Amino acid sequence: MKAITTTQAKDHLDELINAVISDLEPTIVSNNQGQQAVLISLDEFNSWQETLYLLSNPTNAEHLMASIKQAETGQIIKQKLPDLLEL
């Protein structure tokens, strides 16, 4: 993860924003007092928020983890979208 100072961020803000978006890589920004914040793209932030929401419900989290385990062990069933819409 890239780390820069607030002065560097101010001097190159447009470039920094473009890099964070294109590289999908968060950047740590530190001020003179040693405080730090992280700059991420809005899409990445929204993705993290959605993941937190989905995993905040224990039942939903358990179902998602079981589904991931099934996919990793090849226990999947391929279906076409029209077939799923009929369910």
From Swiss-Prot:
InterPro entries linked: Antitoxin_Phd/YefM, phD/YefM_antitoxin, YefM-like_sf
Entry annotated with the keyword Transmembrane helix: no
Keywords from the UniProt entry: Toxin-antitoxin system
Molecular-function GO terms, alphabetical: DNA-binding transcription factor activity; sequence-specific DNA binding
Entries under SUPFAM superfamilies matching the protein: YefM-like
GO BP term (any one): regulation of DNA-templated transcription
Protein's UniProt keywords contain Cell inner membrane: no
Family indicated by similarity: Belongs to the phD/YefM antitoxin family.
NCBIfam families per UniProt: phd_fam
Subunit (UniProt): Forms a complex with YoeB which inhibits its toxin activity.
Protein name per UniProt: Antitoxin YefM
